[in-house]
Amino acid sequence: MMKLTCVLIIAVLFLTACQLTTAETRDEYRAVRSSDEVQNSRSTDDCSTAGCKNVPCCEGLVCTGPSQGPVCQPLA
């Protein structure tokens, strides 16, 4: 019984280590990234690539359309 417990603990530790090493390249494991990387990914949330009524358009886009539903479009 003790050997089985040890094997299970080692397996869990190994799988956790595998997830942490691949977490740097995957977006699905954001919780394990450093706080700087998370802040950098959040900085892109300050602009919009779609509607621009409440959030300004991202760089390279301009807000056009009626006041009820303006959208972000590429600069011409």
Curated annotation (Swiss-Prot):
First and last residue of the signal peptide: 1-23
Keywords: Disulfide bond, Knottin, Neurotoxin, Secreted, Signal, Toxin
InterPro entries to which the protein is assigned, alphabetical: Conotoxin
Region (Disordered): 29-49
Cystine connections: 47-58, 52-63, 57-72
GO cellular component: extracellular region
Main location (coarse class): secreted
Tissue/organ expression: Expressed by the venom duct.
Pfam families noted in UniProt: Conotoxin
Subcellular location: Secreted
One example GO MF annotation: ion channel inhibitor activity
Propiece span(s): 24-42
UniProt domain comment: The presence of a 'disulfide through disulfide knot' structurally defines this protein as a knottin. The cysteine framework is VI/VII (C-C-CC-C-C).
Annotated family: Belongs to the conotoxin O1 superfamily.
Protein name according to UniProt: Conotoxin VnMKLT2-013
Lineage start: Eukaryota, Metazoa, Spiralia, Lophotrochozoa, Mollusca
